[in-house]
């Protein structure tokens, strides 16, 4: 079975830190976690995959295409959630959604409403009024509303209590099963 994501020999150096020869593949309809202590390079790996930081060498093949050569096309097929994001804290969810949906050619309003209802989110609330768990659920609703085939999640369970963390992991399993989606996430919690 062809990998949804194949990372080959990614290298990125910073003063006092280096990612060296990071390689792995993610099969369709699977969940893969990057687990390590703080500062181990999990977020840097995800950012290098997404070209948010430029790796010095290596390649990323996503959906059988070179990600760096087909970045815009590939990004239409993925959902990205970075933990600890408090973007637009004073904006209502409905406002954030109205802006976000403009970036996706395959945005599905019915799908979005399904997840808003499923996650019991109130679109009239401001982002800062949500708990950490509800923030992640909202960001997942956004990510899944354009039929993402791959979710890349950085520390999605960070700051969650054990019950909320387990609920979120259950949601991940449901998404992979029902949405035919793969998930790559980072965490320092095992």
Where are these regions (language model features)?
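Conserved beta-strand
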Residues: 7-10, 17-27, 34-35, 58
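Walker A (P-loop) phosphate-binding loop of ABC-type ATPase nucleotide-binding domains
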Residues: 36-41
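Helix-to-loop junction immediately C-terminal to a conserved catalytic motif
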Residues: 50
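Conserved ABC transporter NBD signature motif
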Residues: 58-69, 73-74
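ABC-family P-loop ATPase nucleotide-binding domains
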Residues: 72, 76, 80-139
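Catalytic Walker B motif of ABC-type/P-loop ATPase nucleotide-binding domains
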Residues: 151-155
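Short loop immediately C-terminal to the Walker-B catalytic DE motif
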Residues: 157-158, 190
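Helix N-cap at the start of a conserved alpha-helix in ABC-type nucleotide-binding domains
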Residues: 162-164
């Amino acid at each position: 079975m062809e990998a949804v994501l194949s990372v080959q020999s990614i290298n990125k150096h910073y003063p006092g830190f280096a990612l060296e020869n990071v390689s792995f593949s993610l099969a369709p309809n699977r969940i893969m976690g990057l687990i390590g202590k703080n500062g181990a390079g999990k977020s840097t790996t995800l950012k290098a995959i997404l070209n948010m930081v430029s790796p010095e060498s290596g390649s990323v093949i996503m959906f059988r295409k070179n990600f760096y050569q087909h970045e815009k096309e590939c990004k239409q097929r993925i959902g990205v959630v970075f933990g600890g994001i408090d973007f637009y804290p004073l904006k209502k969810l409905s406002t954030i959604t109205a802006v976000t949906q403009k970036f996706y050619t395959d945005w599905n309003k019915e799908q979005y409403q399904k997840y808003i209802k499923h996650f019991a989110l109130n679109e009239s609330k401001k982002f800062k009024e949500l708990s950490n768990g509800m923030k992640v659920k909202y960001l997942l609703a956004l990510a899944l509303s354009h039929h993402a085939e791959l979710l890349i999640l950085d520390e999605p369970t960070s700051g969650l209590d054990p019950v909320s963390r387990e609920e979120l992991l259950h949601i991940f399993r449901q998404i992979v099963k029902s949405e035919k989606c793969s998930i790559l996430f980072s965490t320092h919690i095992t």
